[in-house]
């Protein structure tokens, strides 16, 4: 049976940590574990998912729930609340619902204080891992038979009915997803006609849609290193860009960190034209994936091919001209003497930056794509290197298993982020005394996860921002500082500092609080907005150079309503508790941030959310940011428009239900069938409550509360519905804890700020 291990080094001599691995979550298979009843429960969950996989594509993260709820059994479970009419919503009904919800949520808290969970969703991550392990000869050493079995289960479970795979688990089939996952299954040992016909159906989809020459640029790169595509069929990724002077707007150091940290190792592999061992499987794949014989493929034509199913961001003409010039003129010079000397210098610079990233994330790396690319680069440089060995145990940090199988996550988890939201949700209920143990553990995790030092060396040389005092998205070992994670972390420690230490634990020291404020103040852009990891370093026209056909807005770090609002809210709370510390800077930052939020509001009153689905999420942040800055419904046209927008989207069930299509199409779209979603409903309620909706007409809030109460499951959990996270406009990602966090938070605010105040106004 699989077992989730928390804060565990697994006895590896190759693991490094700044805080004794707090927050680390890995799955380990032990054949001796599991009673017959437990094993049957897991198999039932797997069978149930497989039966309904085309209708419900998101797992409910049941393996983790089975384990942790057994390790942390609930106290006496209160009976489920049933509501007939909204008049039946009493304070007792809401409080019982909250107690049931927090009780359950507390049972899924890990012993180190964080909430583990599924952060999967994208379907292009695991192929890079498997291709890298195959090339380096480490596949069987790293992945056990059980790992491979669960990975295959996952891929078959998320194969679409037409035979292909999407960019993410809910998406339509794409060439990128279909080719890479087909290759992954073959490398994992599946036969060319294996999987009860699924392999054959996948191959048919690929060939019917033009074959692998039409895969996206990232796919072309992965196939090239594997030996199933020629490098001359790729658009250039010259590592010489890293030698440009930094004052040029196109310098990679000015790009969004995720973008540059992916293209850094890609440029190293491209610059070396590295190709892995040509195995029988590789030779077979050359025959399986293309519509013409491999030796007849026009690789120059293939450079610019992309299947229409994948084309979210078509290349502008200027980009095609640039790639053609680099390919036909510049690259031939750099591959031969004397230009080869410059190429060697560029490769040395690239690998130096790769090692810096590896060492300062304890070999976790910023994300799963550059993690496996960096690992491959270390092996290419020296197959016997210590760097390559240090990479291997950190692969497990990215693997997660649920009833749908084993997946590769979009980060090494969302530990800090989910914990920060969980604490704020429970605090909002005013039931902290009842759940002080849960809050105390979470508080310790928050304190243990703060980044305590800046990156070593000259930060400008490594293109890094300050990090001392920040909070990361996942763990301190990961360590990349993020604006909204720092803000949410700061909000938590400030809120908990107002409770007795014997109830929630000792507060964070003022010095460490000030360090966090320093990071937040340092991240505000001239326009008042906050981006993610760093300041916005270049211009939006740089997006013309975005070579990734699948993703939008990836080249620079844009400012976002979510990051700006979180920073603003944290500083308003800080100012209240520490009114004299950097008073003028804090006040100016708040003022500029509020103005930025107002400026980027959509004409219909919404805000576009870039990190979750979508307009309900963005509008929650937009409204709460303005309210924190002193705006209200009466004095702010922005808040009035936002409330009108949200109320116009409320469904007959009383809830809100927004489809991921809102993100990619930038138009509000309901979930098919007009279904409400507990997470969207939570966000909308929080925004409306914050904007004073209860004072004007509480009925929409009562209807929404009724929907949430009725949605609660018998055990206090809430149902897993459609996927709710997103990045780069077009790719969805899972936040398994959101279904617990936001109903708790919304009902908590409802109980304390709406119910009693509006009881006399309630209507049918």
Curated annotation (Swiss-Prot):
Catalytic activity: (S)-2,3-epoxysqualene = cycloartenol
Enzyme Commission numbers on file: 5.4.99.8
Recorded GO MF terms: cycloartenol synthase activity
Coiled-coil features, chain-numbered ranges: none
Membrane-crossing segments per the record: 609-629
A GO biological process held by the record: triterpenoid biosynthetic process
Pfam families in the record: SQHop_cyclase_C, SQHop_cyclase_N
Group of enzyme by EC: isomerase
Metal-binding recorded as keyword: no
Entry GO terms, CC: lipid droplet; membrane
Membrane disposition: Single-pass membrane protein
UniProt repeat feature PFTB, residue ranges: 148-189, 513-558, 590-630, 639-680, 701-742
Tissues of expression: Expressed in all leaf tissues.
Biological role: Oxidosqualene cyclase which catalyzes the conversion of oxidosqualene to cycloartenol.
Name of the protein: Cycloartenol synthase
Lineage, broadest ranks: Eukaryota, Viridiplantae, Streptophyta, Embryophyta, Tracheophyta
């Amino acid at each position: 049976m699989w077992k989730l291990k928390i804060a565990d080094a697994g006895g590896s001599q190759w693991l490094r940590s700044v805080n004794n691995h707090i927050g680390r979550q890995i799955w380990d298979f032990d054949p001796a574990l599991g009673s017959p009843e437990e094993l049957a429960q897991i198999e039932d969950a797997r069978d149930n998912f497989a039966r309904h996989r085309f209708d419900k594509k998101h797992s409910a993260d049941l393996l983790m729930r089975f384990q942790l709820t057994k390790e942390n059994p609930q106290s006496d479970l209160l009976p489920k609340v049933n509501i007939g009419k909204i008049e039946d919503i009493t304070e007792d009904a809401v409080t019982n619902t909250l107690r049931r919800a927090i009780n359950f949520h507390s049972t899924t808290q890990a012993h180190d204080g964080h909430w583990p969970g599924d952060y999967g969703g994208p379907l292009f991550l695991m192929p890079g891992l498997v291709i890298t392990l195959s090339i380096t000869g480490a596949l069987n050493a790293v992945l056990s038979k059980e790992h491979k079995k669960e990975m295959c289960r996952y891929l078959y479970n998320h194969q679409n009915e037409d035979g292909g795979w999407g960019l993410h688990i809910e998406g339509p089939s794409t060439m990128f997803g279909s080719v890479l996952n087909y290759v992954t299954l073959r490398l994992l040992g599946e036969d060319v006609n294996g999987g009860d016909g699924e392999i054959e159906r996948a191959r048919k989809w690929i060939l019917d849609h033009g074959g692998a020459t039409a895969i996206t640029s990232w796919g072309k790169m992965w196939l090239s290193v594997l030996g199933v595509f020629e490098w001359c069929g790729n658009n250039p990724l010259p590592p010489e860009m890293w030698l440009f002077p930094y004052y040029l707007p196109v310098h990679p150091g000015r790009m969004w960190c995720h973008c540059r940290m992916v293209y850094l190792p890609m440029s190293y592999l491209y610059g070396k034209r590295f190709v892995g061992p040509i195995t029988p499987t590789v030779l077979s794949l050359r025959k399986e994936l293309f519509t013409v014989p491999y030796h007849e493929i026009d690789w120059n034509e293939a450079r610019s091919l992309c299947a229409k199913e994948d084309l979210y961001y078509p290349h502008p003409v200027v980009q095609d001209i640039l790639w053609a010039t680099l390919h036909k003129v510049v690259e031939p010079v750099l591959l031969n003497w004397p230009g080869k000397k410059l190429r060697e210098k560029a490769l040395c610079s690239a690998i130096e930056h790769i090692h810096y990233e590896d060492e300062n994330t304890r070999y976790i790396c910023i994300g799963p794509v550059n993690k496996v690319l960096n690992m491959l680069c270390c092996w290419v440089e020296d197959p016997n290197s210590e760097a390559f060995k240090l990479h291997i145990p950190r692969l497990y940090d990215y693997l997660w298993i649920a009833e749908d199988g084993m997946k590769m996550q979009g980060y090494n988890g969302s530990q800090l982020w989910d914990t920060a939201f969980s604490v704020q949700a429970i605090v909002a209920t005013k039931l902290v005394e009842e759940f002080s143990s849960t809050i105390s553990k979470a508080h310790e995790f928050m304190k243990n996860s703060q980044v305590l030092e800046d990156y070593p060396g000259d930060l400008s040389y490594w293109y890094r921002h300050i990090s001392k005092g920040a909070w990361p998205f996942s763990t301190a070992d990961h360590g990349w500082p993020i604006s909204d994670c720092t803000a949410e972390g700061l909000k938590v420690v400030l809120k908990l500092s107002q409770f007795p230490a014997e109830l929630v634990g000792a507060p964070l020291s003022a010095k460490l609080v000030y360090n966090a404020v320093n990071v937040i103040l340092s991240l505000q852009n001239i326009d008042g907005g906050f981006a993610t990891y760093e300041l916005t370093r270049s211009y939006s026209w740089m997006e013309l150079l975005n070579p990734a056909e699948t993703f939008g807005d990836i080249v620079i770090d844009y400012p976002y309503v979510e990051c700006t609002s979180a920073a603003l809210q944290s500083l308003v709370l800080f100012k209240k508790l520490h009114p004299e510390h950097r008073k003028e800077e804090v006040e100016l930052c708040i003022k500029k941030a509020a103005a930025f939020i107002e400026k980027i509001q959509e004409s219909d009153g919404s805000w576009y959310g870039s990190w979750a689905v979508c307009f309900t999420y963005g509008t929650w942040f937009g409204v709460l940011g303005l309210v924190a800055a002193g705006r209200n419904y009466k004095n702010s046209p922005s808040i009035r428009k936002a409330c009108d927008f949200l109320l116009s989207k409320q469904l007959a069930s009383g809830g809100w239900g927004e489809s991921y299509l809102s993100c990619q199409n930038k138009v509000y779209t309901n979930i098919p069938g007009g279904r409400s979603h507990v997470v969207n409903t939570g966000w909308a309620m929080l925004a409306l409550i914050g904007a004073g909706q209860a004072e004007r007409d509480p009925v929409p809030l009562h209807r929404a509360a009724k929907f949430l109460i009725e949605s609660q499951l018998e055990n206090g959990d809430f149902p897993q519905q459609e996927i709710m996270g997103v990045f780069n406009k077009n790719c969805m990602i899972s936040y398994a804890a959101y279904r617990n966090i936001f109903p708790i938070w919304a009902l908590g605010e409802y109980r304390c700020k709406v119910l009693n105040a509006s009881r006399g106004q309630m209507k049918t």
